[in-house]
């Protein structure tokens, strides 16, 4: 099969056209340091098969049953991959097994209808779970949980003062 590599900045409209172009039959990513991976979530909305390592942030929205999970091994992140001042010597990320990924790509090409159904199911799950309203509620839940106990309303209990009737103020001298 033909494989096209894209590199550079694309507008939202261009990305949408690419995701939904009839010649694009599947979405492939060997990502390893993406975090949440918004492009893969967006690609899932096209209903086409997704081939990617289901590791790190992608686990939040790529279902093992509906995605072609690419085999990977976890490796230490090279220090050169971090912005200055952000290095973390304990950080690890997945590196795809290229040989097995190649075999899976060929299988998707040869058995496209089987994988196409999985892509459609992933689309349905993500369109249900990743609406703007559901993300808003999820964020509110996280913020509420983080802020619970940070500040609490407390009642103010002041002592009761007895009023003295015959209190005289001292006379002040003019300066």
Located regions from the model:
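Nucleotide-activated donor-binding/catalytic signature segment of Leloir-type glycosyltransferases, i.e.
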Residues: 1-18, 25
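Short hydrophobic beta-strand element within catalytic cores of glycosyltransferases
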Residues: 49-52, 68-71
């Amino acid at each position: 099969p033909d494989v096209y590599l894209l590199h550079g900045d694309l507008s939202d409209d261009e990305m949408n056209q690419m995701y939904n172009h009839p010649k694009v039959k599947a979405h492939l990513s060997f990502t390893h340091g993406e975090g949440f991976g918004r492009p893969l979530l967006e690609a899932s909305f096209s209903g086409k098969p997704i081939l990617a390592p289901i590791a790190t942030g992608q686990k939040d929205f790529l279902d093992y049953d509906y995605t072609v999970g690419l085999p990977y091994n976890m490796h230490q992140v090279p220090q050169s991959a971090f912005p200055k001042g952000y290095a973390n010597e304990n950080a690890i990320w997945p590196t795809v097994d290229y040989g097995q990924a190649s075999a899976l790509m060929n299988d998707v090409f040869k058995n496209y209808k089987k994988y196409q159904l999985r892509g459609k199911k992933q689309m349905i799950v993500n369109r249900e779970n990743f609406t703007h309203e559901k993300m808003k509620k999820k964020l509110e839940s996280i913020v509420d949980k983080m802020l619970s106990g940070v500040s609490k309303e407390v009642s103010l209990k002041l002592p009761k003062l007895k009023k003295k009737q015959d209190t005289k103020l001292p006379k002040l001298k003019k300066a």
